[in-house]
Amino acid sequence: MSDEIEDRPRTRSRTPSVDTQSYTINEEAHHIITDSDSSSSENEDGEGNETNSSDDSSESGSVERFLDEIVPTTSTSFIPNDTPDPATLFDITEYIFDSIVQSTNACDFSEAFALQAKTSAVINSKSMELKNLIEQTKVRLPELQAKFKNGTQTLRTIRKNLDNAKSRIQVMNDVLQTDYPIEFNQARDKILERTLDSDEEVI
C-alpha cells in the first residue's frame, strides 16, 4: 500500500488554499502604504544626516581639543590673569566726586563773592572814568585843533617879520659901513671885545 502511494505521481493542487479576496489591497491602502514608506525612508535619511552632522561636529570638536592640547593658548590682554579687574582698582566717578567735594570744602565762597563784587566795582568805576575822559577829549579836541591852526598862522607872521627885520638890519649895516667906515669898525670891535657881566649873562 505504501509502495503504491509512493509510485503515484505527485500532483500539486491548483486550487488556492486561502481565500485571496479577503487579503486583496485596494488602491487607497496601497497609496497610504507607499506614502508611509516614503516618509519613513525620508525620516531614515534625515536621521542619517543628523547622525552624520553630529559625527562631523564631534570630530571637529575632538580636533579642536587636540589642537588646544598641542598649541598653548596665549593671552592677548596686557593685564595678567592673576591681577584683579582694573575697574575695582580705580573708579573714575568716585575720584571726580571726591575732587569736587574737596575743592568745595577748601574754597570759601563768601570771600570769593566779596572779591568778585570788589573787582566788579573797581572795573565799573574805571570804566566810568574812562568814559568821562573820552567825553572830555572829544570836547577839547576841536579847541586844541583851532588853537594849533591859529598858532601856525602866528608862526608864519612872526617868521615873516623876522625876515623883514633881518633884511633891514643888513641894509643899515651896508649904509653905515659905506658912509662911516671908521666908526663902524670901532663899534664892531668894541662889541666883540666887551665882557658880559653875570647879570647880563643870566639875562
UniProtKB/Swiss-Prot annotation:
This is Biogenesis of lysosome-related organelles complex 1 subunit KXD1. InterPro entries: BLOC-1_subunit_KXD1, Exonuc_VII_ssu_sf, KxDL_dom. Keywords: Coiled coil, Endosome, Transport. Component of the biogenesis of lysosome-related organelles complex-1 (BLOC-1) involved in endosomal cargo sorting. One of its GO terms (biological process) is DNA catabolic process. Component of the biogenesis of lysosome-related organelles complex-1 (BLOC-1). GO terms for cellular component: BLOC-1 complex; endosome; exodeoxyribonuclease VII complex. Residues 14-25 have a biased composition (Polar residues). Residues 126-178 form a coiled coil. It comes from the Eukaryota. Residues 1-62 are annotated as: Disordered. It holds the Pfam family KxDL. GO terms for molecular function: exodeoxyribonuclease VII activity. Residues 49-61 have a biased composition (Low complexity).
